[in-house]
Structure formats: structure tokens, C-alpha cells
Amino acid sequence: MLIIAEIGQNHNGDLEIAKKLIRVAREKGADIVKFQLYDVDRIFPPDFQWYKEAKEAQLTKEQVLELAGDCENVGIEFSASVFDLERLQWTEELGMKRYKIASRSIYEEELINKIAATGKDIMVSLGMYKEDGFPEINTKGKVDFLYCVAKYPTMPEDLDFLNVDFSRHAGFSDHTIGITASLIAMARGARIIEKHFTLDKQMYGPDHSGSMNPNELGQLVRYSQQIEDILGHNTAK
């Protein structure tokens, strides 16, 4: 099982918070911490509700390199969703192991093709994919598709696990509150769980209230290990 603690913007632009999130994620047993690398003016209009907060959480190249180094020092994998070619170049320079294509980028053909050309493994959220089946991504690396509902937060009734084949969807990008949905997805065969992670749900920002806190991350990791034991497999890593 692969557990991804999605830091996203939950560092609020504060590198010390970002580093603490990395350390705590490692202590609680996550396999990967993931960030979002973007130019806010390319993805959000100035009147977007959370524009100011997204701008403050926008990481520079130097900050990305520092955080990737911090991940290496504590022994957890650094990964990211990159939203443009400039930031793809940053992550290639630091030798990032695998990429995440976010739901909002699923139709950005040039970006996807450039990511695919790296030959690295790719995880793809399908929350905004409108076609039947799966998008075609030509790459030498492995492609894992994640079931996702692009609604924040996702309500339990928005999920459709009975019609999700987790032998084809490798995992679940979970935007529900709590960890119940992730546990059900794992029991149904998901091998990858990605979920937003925060130090404190009461912190200010768009994603904190719907994120898992350190205790929930620890529970998710422990239960995932038990589910692996019960199902008799240890995959994804």
C-alpha cells in the first residue's frame, strides 16, 4: 500500500510549517509527501475566492529544492503535481521519482506529454475526466489511475465505489472528511491512497478543515497495514 500525505497548500507559504509537515508525515508512516507547484496567475483568476491564499502558498524554485532536500534528509519521498512546464523542469533538475497529474490538468495535452516523456512513473487523478475508460498516456514508466471526485469536500453520497473497479483504478484520491472512505477503498482493492494532510484542521486556508490530521494519518497507516495482512498482499511500493 502506498500512502501519500498531500501537503498541497497546507504549509500556507511558511517553510517551517512545510518542514514540520514533512517530519510528522514521516513519523506517522506515510510513504510520500506531495506538494502543488504552480503559478497562481496561470490557474486562478484574481477574483478567485482563495486567490490570496494560493498566492502566498506559491513555492519558488529555491524553496522546492530546499523542501526536496529536507525530504531526503528525513527519509520520505518528495513528489508534486506540476501545473506548468517551468515547474516540470524544476522537478526534473532535482530528480523527482514520480509525478502526479491533477484532475484539473487532465486535458492539458502538452503538459501531460512532457511529463510522460520523462519516463517516470505517473499517478493520474480522474476527477475531471469526462470520457469513458481511461486517458491514453504513452510513457515508459508506470501509469496509475486514481478514482477521484473533484468536489471539496466530497460527501459520502458523492462516491460510487460499487461501480469502481479497483483492479483498474490503482487507488483513490480522497477528498472526504475523515479516513473511512479511504479504508473502504483499500478493502475494495485500492493500492494507493492520496489524502490532504494538515497539522491542525483549525488553521486558516482552503484545505485544512477537510484534511487528515497527524492522528488520522497514523490511523490510516496502521489500518492500511492490517488490511494488507488480511487481504494477503503488499503492493504499490
Question: Locations of the language-model features?
Answer:
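Catalytic cores and adjacent flexible loops of soluble metabolic enzymes
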Residues: 1-237
